[in-house]
A protein has these predicted regions:
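Boundary at the C-terminal end of the N-terminal hydrophobic targeting segment
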Residues: 15-25
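Mature N-terminal segment immediately following signal peptide/propeptide cleavage
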Residues: 28-67
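M16/MPP (pitrilysin/insulinase) zinc-metallopeptidase core fold and M16-derived inactive scaffolds
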Residues: 63-130, 173, 194-198
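Acidic/histidine-enriched alpha-helical segments
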Residues: 102, 110, 151-169
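M16/insulysin-pitrilysin zinc metalloprotease superfamily fold
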Residues: 95-96, 130-161
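Scaffold signal of the M16-like zinc-metallopeptidase fold and its non-catalytic homologs
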Residues: 21-22, 93-94, 139, 146, ...
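Buried hydrophobic packing residues in well-ordered domains
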Residues: 48, 66, 84-86, 127, ...
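Bacterial N-terminal signal peptides
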Residues: 5-17
Length: 213
């Protein structure tokens, strides 16, 4: 699956009163866009990556979030649910960090006491982790690594399909989720919002490694 548009990196920092980007000269290739309600916006000139920096002095922790402006609306009939499955695959390992080497993304996050998760929606997919603030650089390195070097293997897809199928069944057994799914399918008949972010069962079951790549 080809990622569309440029992602946004969001950092909620709880370190010093002034963040490094604010108090020091900007690194080459980073431009300041604006300041709004205490939020600093930057842009990486080489690829358009947006950066939002939100300092918070309350606790010695930080949250790093990467949001890709692609979601289930970018899917077509036959590939619905692929974005959500790819979200799951993002935790399975990369060329550099993988279970075969003994340290994949999840194990690295656990080692530093971080809590990581992700969500998929119609217009975006986001990945986030909260950790002690001294590990922000490591979290960003891991995000950059899986952005570029994700391993999408048959065995990993097979294991995640069980997880995704169980998630799908929970939704089918929820009256509220079923109502919302039918509402969107009726209201957006000629629009990609008509299919749920988790996808249709037949499409989920036929998802292949080639499609995800």
């Amino acid at each position: 699956m080809r990622i569309l548009d440029f992602p946004i990196l969001v950092c909620l920092l709880s370190a010093s009163p002034a963040s490094p980007l604010i108090s020091q000269a900007l690194p080459v290739g980073v431009e300041h866009v604006q300041t709004l309600d205490g939020i600093e916006e930057y842009r990486l000139s080489s690829n358009g990556l947006g950066i939002l920096l939100m300092p918070n002095e309350g606790l010695p922790v930080a949250t790093v979030m990467v949001t890709y402006k692609v979601g289930s609306r970018n899917e077509v009939t036959g590939t619905t649910g692929a974005t959500h499955i790819l979200e799951h695959m993002m935790f399975k390992g990369t060329e550099k960090f993988n279970s075969a080497k003994g340290f994949d993304y999840s194990s690295q996050m656990e080692r530093i006491g971080a809590r990581a998760n992700a969500t998929t929606w119609f217009d975006r997919t986001n990945y986030y982790a909260t950790m002690p603030s001294e590990y922000v650089s490591m979290a960003i390195e891991l995000e950059a690594d899986r952005m570029r070097g994700l391993l999408i293997r048959e065995e990993d897809l097979a294991s995640e399909m069980t997880v995704v199928s169980n998630e799908y069944e929970r939704g089918e057994n929820s009256p509220v989720r079923t109502l919302i799914k039918e509402l969107f399918a009726t209201a957006y008949m000629a629009h990609p919002y008509s299919h749920p972010t988790i996808g249709w069962r037949s499409d989920i079951e036929s998802t292949s490694v080639e499609e995800l790549r």
